[in-house]
From Swiss-Prot:
N6,N6,N6-trimethyllysine modified-residue sites: K14
Taxonomic placement: Eukaryota, Viridiplantae, Streptophyta, Embryophyta, Tracheophyta
In-chain residues carrying the UniProt-annotated modification N6-carboxylysine: K201
Residues where Mg(2+) binds: K201, D203, E204
InterPro entries: RuBisCO, RuBisCo_large_chain_AS, RuBisCO_lsu_C, RuBisCO_lsu_C_sf, RuBisCO_lsu_fd_N, RuBisCO_lsu_N_sf, RuBisCO_lsuI
SUPFAM superfamilies with a match to the protein in the record: RuBisCo, C-terminal domain, RuBisCO, large subunit, small (N-terminal) domain
One Gene Ontology term from the biological process aspect of the record: photorespiration
Location within or outside the cell: Plastid, Chloroplast
Active site per UniProt: K175 (proton acceptor), H294 (proton acceptor)
HAMAP family: RuBisCO_L_type1
Record protein name field: Ribulose bisphosphate carboxylase large chain
Cofactor note: Binds 1 Mg(2+) ion per subunit.
Gene: rbcL
Main location: plastid
GO molecular function: magnesium ion binding; monooxygenase activity; ribulose-bisphosphate carboxylase activity
Length: 475
C-alpha cells in the first residue's frame, strides 16, 4: 500500500498497535483436547489484514499487550498465550471473517464463568483495530467442564421431583408484570395452577417494589400453589424471583423460599451476574430447590449479527454456572429465534454430546461429560394455535410458557389454563398415535376444541394473531 493510498485507520494501526501476527497467528498449531476454543466473527478496520485482526484478538484476550514488556521474559509465552490458528471468510460478507482462537486451560480459574468471560470477552471488544467483533461459539474441554457443578438438578431429577413424564411442562408468566398487590398476584397464581398448569412465574423485573414486597409475594404465592396442589393432586410450582441488589439479599430470599417448602426459585442470570448465579445454583442443589433462569438483557449482547456474543455462548455459560430452566426463544412467537439456530442451542442445553453442525450454528463438537441438562423454556407471544408446532419443535423436555396466552382468555385465568392443558394433551396424544403435528396441527386443535369449550373460546380469540417478522439471527 503506497503512502498516497493508506487510510487513516491503517496509519493509526501501524503507529499505535503492535504487529501481533508474528507471535499470535499460528496456522500450523494443532489444538489440544484441553484447549478452550473460540470462534470469533471479526470485522477488521480498513487496512488491517484478517490475520493481524485474528492475532490481535488472541493476544488481547490472553497474554498480550500493545508493546513488549520486560516481564515477558519471566514466564513462558508459548505455554500461556492464546493462538489464532485458523481464519475463514464469512460467506456473503466482504469484510467479515471467522477467527478461531485456542486458549490454554491454565489461563482460567476452575469453576468460574466470571473469570472465563473476563478473559475471553472482557477487554478485546473495544479494540481499535476492529470495527466489530462477535463471539459465535466456544468449545469447553472436558477438563474444564468437570470443574463446574452445573445445573442444580437437571432434567431427570426435576421430572422425578414433579412426578411428571412424557410431555412438555406448562407455565404462565403472571401479567401485568408490575403493579399488582401481593394478594391479587397470589390469586392469579392460584387460578392458573388449578386450571392445569404446572408452573406460574414472576416476570424478570418483579423483585421487591413498593407495590409488592418480596416477602408478601412469596407468602401469597406459596399459599396459592399449596391450595392448587390439594385440589388437583398434582405438584405445582411458582418461580419466585430471588434476584436482588446484593448477593446477600438474594440468598436471604432463596432461604425463605426453601423454608416455605416451595419447589423452585428464579434468577435473572445476566443482570444478576454469573458469580451470583453460581452461588445460588450451589445453594439450590444443596437444599433441593429447582432453579429457573431468565435471560433478561440477553438481546443487548446477542441481537446484533456482527458484534457482541451469540446466545449459544450464553446458553453454554448458563449450563456451566447452573440453572434447571432457561428461556430459549420460541421460533413461532413474538421474540427472536430462527428454527435451526434455536434448535442448535437447545441441543447444547439438553444433550450430553453435540456434534459440530454449522447448518445450526454449532462451530465445535461439545461433550458435556456428566453435567446435567437444562430444560429450554419457550415463552413470548404464544397461544393455543402454536401448541402443535411447539410440541413438535421442542419435544417433551421443555417448558412451554403462555402468559398472555393464558391470562388473556376471555373467561379468565383458570379457563385459559384449561385451554392450554387440553391443547397440549391433545398434541401429545396425536403425536404418540403417529400423527404429523407439523401438517395436521390445526386439525388436531380443532378436534380437541369440540369437547373443550375453554379451548374453543381460546381458538376463536387468537385465530388471527401472528408475529411475522424476519429473524435477525441467521447464519
Amino acid at each position: 500500500m503506497s503512502p498516497q493510498t493508506e487510510t487513516k485507520a491503517s496509519v493509526g494501526f501501524k503507529a499505535g498497535v503492535k504487529d501481533y501476527k508474528l507471535t499470535y497467528y499460528t496456522p500450523d498449531y494443532e489444538t489440544k483436547d484441553t484447549d478452550i476454543l473460540a470462534a470469533f466473527r471479526v470485522t477488521p478496520q480498513p487496512g488491517v489484514p484478517p490475520e493481524e485482526a485474528g492475532a490481535a484478538v488472541a493476544a488481547e484476550s490472553s497474554t498480550g499487550t500493545w508493546t513488549t514488556v520486560w516481564t515477558d521474559g519471566l514466564t513462558s509465552l508459548d505455554r500461556y498465550k492464546g493462538r489464532c490458528y485458523h481464519i475463514e471468510p464469512v460467506p456473503g460478507e466482504e469484510s467479515q471473517f471467522i477467527a478461531y482462537v485456542a486458549y490454554p486451560l491454565d489461563l482460567f480459574e476452575e469453576g468460574s464463568v466470571t473469570n472465563m468471560f473476563t478473559s475471553i470477552v472482557g477487554n478485546v471488544f473495544g479494540f481499535k483495530a476492529l470495527r466489530a467483533l462477535r463471539l459465535e461459539d466456544l468449545r469447553i474441554p472436558n477438563a474444564y467442564v468437570k470443574t463446574f457443578q452445573g445445573p442444580p438438578h437437571g432434567i431427570q431429577v426435576e421430572r422425578d421431583k414433579l412426578n411428571k413424564y412424557g410431555r412438555p411442562l406448562l407455565g404462565c408468566t403472571i401479567k401485568p408484570k408490575l403493579g399488582l398487590s401481593a394478594k391479587n398476584y397470589g390469586r392469579a397464581v392460584y387460578e392458573c395452577l388449578r386450571g392445569g398448569l404446572d408452573f406460574t412465574k414472576d416476570d424478570e423485573n418483579v423483585n421487591s417494589q413498593p407495590f409488592m414486597r418480596w416477602r408478601d409475594r412469596f407468602l401469597f404465592c406459596a399459599e396459592a400453589l399449596f391450595k392448587a396442589q390439594e385440589e388437583t393432586g398434582e405438584i405445582k410450582g411458582h418461580y419466585l424471583n430471588a434476584t436482588a441488589g446484593t448477593c446477600e439479599e438474594m440468598m436471604k430470599r432463596a432461604v425463605f423460599a426453601r423454608e416455605l417448602g416451595v419447589p423452585i426459585v428464579m434468577h435473572d442470570y445476566l443482570t444478576g451476574g454469573f458469580t451470583a448465579n453460581t452461588t445460588l445454583a450451589h445453594y439450590c442443589r444443596d437444599n433441593g430447590l429447582l432453579l429457573h433462569i431468565h435471560r433478561a438483557m440477553h438481546a443487548v449482547i446477542d441481537r446484533q449479527k456482527n458484534h457482541g456474543m451469540h446466545f449459544r455462548v450464553l446458553a453454554k455459560a448458563l449450563r456451566m454456572s447452573g440453572g434447571d430452566h432457561i428461556h430459549a426463544g420460541t421460533v413461532v412467537g413474538k421474540l427472536e429465534g430462527e428454527r435451526e439456530i434455536t434448535l442448535g442451542f437447545v441441543d447444547l442445553l439438553r444433550d450430553d454430546f453435540v456434534e459440530k453442525d454449522r447448518s445450526r450454528g454449532i462451530y465445535f463438537t461439545q461433550d458435556w461429560v456428566s453435567l446435567p441438562g437444562v430444560l429450554p423454556v419457550a415463552s413470548g407471544g404464544i397461544h393455543v394455535w402454536h401448541m402443535p408446532a411447539l410440541t413438535e419443535i421442542f419435544g417433551d423436555d421443555s417448558v412451554l410458557q403462555f402468559g398472555g396466552g393464558t391470562l388473556g382468555h376471555p373467561w379468565g385465568n383458570a379457563p385459559g389454563a384449561v385451554a392450554n392443558r387440553v391443547a397440549l394433551e391433545a398434541c401429545v396424544q396425536a403425536r404418540n398415535e403417529g400423527r404429523d403435528l407439523a401438517r395436521e396441527g390445526n386439525e388436531i386443535i380443532r378436534e380437541a376444541s369440540k369437547w373443550s369449550p375453554e379451548l374453543a373460546a381460546a381458538c376463536e380469540i387468537w385465530k388471527e394473531i401472528k408475529f411475522e417478522f424476519q429473524a435477525m439471527d441467521t447464519l
